[in-house]
């Protein structure tokens, strides 16, 4: 979801949550800043062993349709603007790269030799890197969930499945572009012969079946803030996997991750422009939504990940990603700071009392997150060995 950021990995013992933050970020003291009237009800993720037809991990007590109905008119009025300012960030299909551009050609006489070369390049890649790349791929493969999520948003959803509104065109075309990411990473990992594809496929099926709980409440203010954050997070994550692939000697894989990161950057630009427009026409509503989302903390899209074995799979995968510097708590703070600056939140004028409180909260949050991350990093915690089914139950330090 490009090869820009280069972060130092956090201490392997630094535990993370589904929001990508150190557990210390969830301290009680953080709650004193709650001021928004649109705060959602906290949801819990719990294992479900009672009903076989229910997803193994559920998101409970969800709030819906929190945006006042009159604000739907804002998004209807932005149809023309979106056509000129958002759809321009899509690429025509004929100008897009396709997964086959980076994979051995099965129609070629040299196909087997190309596969052998790929396996030779990847045989020394560390298991930790493979786990993170698999987790990234699984996240990309849960694309049906993300299109579903976008189509829950009031005022911008695709009402027919083939609507010609700018918002609907964007959602379908964005989904189509993103679809290439999981396809490419899936096939590449399959060809390495180093991962358990059946366990990976089960994880993907479990994840799509479980859905996701971004706590966007059918509210496009919250939804587009979430996607702005997530597209930048995936840009950073894929950029860092590209850098590490190069360090491990697989320049083809580095190119694969880099080209995906470039897509994510382009998509980030589109989503951040939407939120920037909301700050322009409704600064109070936009800053309240931003504060609300940050108080709830931005959950990663795959936070309900499960492989049929590990109830803490997402947390363990995230811990490894943090160890090797692919996505860290520092990145979370950097993303927030980037968006606050991009949307000029500090310079907002004419806000309500609640709006001023929200402004103060979000403008001061990134430094607080960094301090909490540094504190968590300094704490020595026991390291445990955890088996990952994706790599044939090999154990990694978490």
Swiss-Prot record:
Superkingdom, natural source: Eukaryota
Keyword Lipid metabolism: yes
Any one GO CC term of the record: chloroplast stroma
Chief location bin: plastid
Co-factor note (free text): Binds 2 Fe(2+) ions per subunit.
Disulfide bonds: none
Enzymatic reactions: octadecanoyl-[ACP] + 2 reduced [2Fe-2S]-[ferredoxin] + O2 + 2 H(+) = (9Z)-octadecenoyl-[ACP] + 2 oxidized [2Fe-2S]-[ferredoxin] + 2 H2O
Sequence positions that bind Fe cation 1: 140, 178, 181, 264
One Pfam family named in its UniProt record: FA_desaturase_2
Cofactor(s) annotated in UniProt: Fe(2+)
The keyword Magnesium belongs to this UniProt entry's keyword annotation: no
Feature: transit peptide: 1-34
EC number from the UniProt entry: 1.14.19.2
CDD domains on file: Acyl_ACP_Desat (cd01050)
GO molecular function annotations of the record: metal ion binding; stearoyl-[ACP] desaturase activity
Chain intervals for the UniProt region annotation (Disordered): 46-66
Positions bound to Fe cation 2: 178, 231, 264, 267
GO annotation terms (biological process): fatty acid biosynthetic process
Key words, A-Z: Chloroplast, Fatty acid biosynthesis, Fatty acid metabolism, Iron, Lipid biosynthesis, Lipid metabolism, Metal-binding, Oxidoreductase, Plastid, Transit peptide
Broad EC category: oxidoreductase
Listed pathway(s): Lipid metabolism; fatty acid metabolism
Subunit structure: Homodimer.
Protein family (similarity comment): Belongs to the fatty acid desaturase type 2 family.
Summary of the function given for this chain in its UniProt record: Converts stearoyl-ACP to oleoyl-ACP by introduction of a cis double bond between carbons 9 and 10 of the acyl chain.
Name of this chain's protein: Stearoyl-[acyl-carrier-protein] 9-desaturase, chloroplastic
């Amino acid at each position: 979801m490009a090869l820009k950021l280069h972060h130092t990995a956090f201490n392997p013992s630094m535990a993370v949550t589904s929001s990508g933050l150190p557990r210390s970020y969830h301290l009680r003291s953080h709650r004193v800043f709650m001021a928004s009237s649109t705060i959602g009800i906290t949801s819990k993720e719990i294992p479900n062993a009672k009903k076989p037809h229910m997803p193994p991990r559920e998101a409970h007590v969800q709030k819906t349709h929190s945006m006042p109905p009159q604000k739907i008119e804002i998004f209807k009025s932005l149809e023309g603007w979106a056509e000129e300012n958002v759809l321009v960030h899509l690429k025509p299909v004929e100008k897009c790269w396709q997964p086959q551009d980076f994979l051995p050609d099965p129609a070629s006489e040299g196909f087997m030799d190309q596969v052998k070369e790929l396996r030779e390049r990847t045989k020394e890649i560390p298991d930790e890197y493979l786990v993170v790349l698999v987790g990234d791929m699984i996240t990309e493969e849960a694309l049906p969930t993300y299109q579903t999520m976008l189509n829950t948003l009031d005022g911008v959803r695709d009402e027919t499945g083939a609507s010609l509104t700018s918002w609907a065109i964007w959602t379908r075309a964005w989904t189509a572009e993103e679809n290439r990411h999981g396809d490419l990473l899936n096939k590449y990992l399959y060809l390495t012969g180093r991962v358990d594809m059946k366990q990976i496929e089960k994880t993907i099926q479990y994840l799509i079946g479980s859905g996701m709980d971004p706590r966007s409440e059918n509210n496009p203010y919250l939804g587009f803030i979430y996607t702005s954050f997530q597209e930048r997070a995936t840009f950073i994550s894929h950029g860092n996997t590209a850098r590490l692939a190069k360090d491990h000697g697989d320049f083809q894989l580095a190119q694969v991750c880099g080209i995906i990161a470039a897509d994510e950057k382009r998509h980030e630009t589109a989503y951040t422009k939407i939120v920037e427009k909301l700050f322009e026409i409704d600064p109070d509503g936009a800053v309240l939504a931003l504060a609300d989302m940050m108080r709830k903390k931005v959950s990663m899209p795959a936070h309900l990940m499960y492989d049929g074995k590990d109830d803490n799979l997402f947390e363990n995968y995230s811990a490894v990603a943090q160890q090797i510097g692919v996505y860290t708590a520092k990145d979370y703070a950097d993303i927030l700071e980037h968006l606050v600056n991009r949307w000029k939140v500090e310079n907002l004028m004419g806000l309500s009392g609640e709006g001023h409180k929200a402004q103060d909260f979000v403008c001061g949050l990134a430094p607080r997150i960094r301090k909490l991350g540094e504190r968590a990093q300094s704490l020595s915690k026991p390291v445990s060995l955890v088996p990952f089914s994706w790599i044939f139950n090999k154990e990694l330090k978490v």
